[in-house]
A protein has these predicted regions:
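Active-site lining segments that contact anionic ligands and/or coordinate catalytic metals
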Residues: 23-25, 29-31, 66, 71, ...
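Radical SAM enzyme core and accessory elements
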Residues: 73-143
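C-terminal accessory region of radical SAM enzymes
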Residues: 1-10, 37-89
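Generic marker of residues within folded, mature protein domains
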Residues: 16-18, 22, 61-64, 91
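Radical SAM enzyme [4Fe-4S]-AdoMet core and its adjacent flexible, acidic
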Residues: 1-31, 44, 96
Length: 143
């Protein structure tokens, strides 16, 4: 089957497929210091440890999907949930910015449209993506 990356990724995912920076992976810089991800290193953010002292992530639970109130109830599974963008736009690593959510939901809805078309040909009949009437999860939460 031909794959269209972001659109087809959502068709085959059953749960979030984020980068998991800070919860499952970290970056080691050329100087031996650890960072949440390469973006934090390039942004000159404070390190989270080094090869000598080890890893020290303050409030590490905040990097986990279980502590991300918006993301943990979302089904835009292809979203990368970039914690650096979260920190940049909302000042919180576990809260996404408006733009990141909207882009991910536009991708998700395009995946839904693709799925509807494929299913008219009997392809991916067992796949299910619910139709939604919003592109920003904050709209859903505010209601």
């Amino acid at each position: 089957m031909v794959q269209l990356n972001i659109l087809t990724d959502r068709l085959f995912l059953k749960e979030m497929n984020n980068c998991n920076a800070g919860s499952e992976v970290v970056t080691i810089a050329p100087n031996g210091e650890f960072y949440i991800c390469p973006a934090f290193y390039l942004d000159n953010a404070p390190n989270i440890g080094d090869l000598i002292k080890g890893l020290d992530i303050k409030n590490g639970q905040l990097y986990k999907i279980s502590h991300a109130p918006i993301c943990r109830i979302c089904d835009a599974y292809q979203c990368k949930r970039c914690v650096w963008l979260n920190k940049l736009y909302t000042h919180e690593v576990n809260t996404p910015g408006h733009e990141q959510c909207v882009v991910s939901h536009i991708e998700r809805n395009a995946s839904w449209l693709l799925l509807m078309e494929l299913q008219t040909y009997g392809i991916l009949d067992d796949c299910k993506i619910e139709k939604i009437a919003y592109i920003d999860p904050f709209e859903k939460i505010e209601k």
